[in-house]
């Protein structure tokens, strides 16, 4: 196992990172999906105990990846938010992150939890719900009609691995689609219904494992 795994997608060298992100070196761009900022706050508000983590931990992971890869942009493939923006505790952490990384471009595709972003004032590049970026079609959900190789999220693919209890987030590589694992730790997941030729790459204990 290693911290990252290089794969060629649509003729481009792409790095699958153990932090559940995809790095495009030629564009210095990180892709993540299903960040769900604010979800941990909602759980705690309703008295649901959670392990350590949440917004601060997720933003720290992004900052670490930016420093390690030299990325100049981070694009979120939908579900940047989870819940309302007003008075959200996570917003303080987000504003501190943007202050420390003011030169970093943060782009967001619209996901099913992102309706409030238009008026949010979060220093984001709002990309709409579909972007053609070089050979890639960026979407929140898989789209078999897209003209390019699809990069997306929404599915939250997970796998079981013998010898490692629990379920682990995974990249799901198909012939013309790469589904990213959910970046947030506070999401459910499911085992993909794979077809012949599909590949899964699991993220576990800071390493990636091709299955």
Enumerate the language-model features and the residues they cover.
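Extended recognition/assembly regions associated with phosphoester-bond processing machinery
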Residues: 1-77, 81-211
């Amino acid at each position: 196992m290693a911290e990252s795994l290089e794969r060629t997608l649509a003729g481009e060298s792409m790095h699958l990172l153990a932090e559940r992100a995809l790095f495009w070196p030629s564009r210095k761009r990180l892709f993540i999906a299903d960040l769900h900022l604010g979800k941990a706050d909602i759980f705690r508000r309703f008295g649901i105990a959670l392990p350590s983590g949440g917004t601060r931990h997720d933003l720290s992971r992004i900052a670490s990846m930016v420093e390690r890869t030299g990325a100049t942009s981070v694009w979120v493939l939908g579900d940047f938010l989870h819940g309302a923006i007003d008075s959200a505790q996570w917003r303080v952490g987000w504003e501190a992150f943007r202050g420390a990384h003011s030169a970093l471009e943060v782009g967001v595709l619209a996901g099913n939890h992102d309706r409030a972003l238009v008026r949010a004032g979060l220093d984001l590049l709002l990309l709409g719900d579909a972007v053609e970026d070089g050979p890639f079609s960026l979407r929140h959900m898989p789209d078999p009609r897209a003209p390019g190789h699809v990069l997306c999220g929404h599915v939250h693919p997970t796998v079981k691995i013998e010898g490692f209890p629990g379920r682990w987030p995974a990249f799901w590589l198909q012939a013309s689609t790469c589904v990213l694992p959910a970046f947030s730790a506070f999401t459910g997941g499911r085992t993909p219904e794979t077809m012949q030729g599909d590949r899964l790459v699991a993220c576990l204990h800071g390493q990636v494992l091709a299955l």
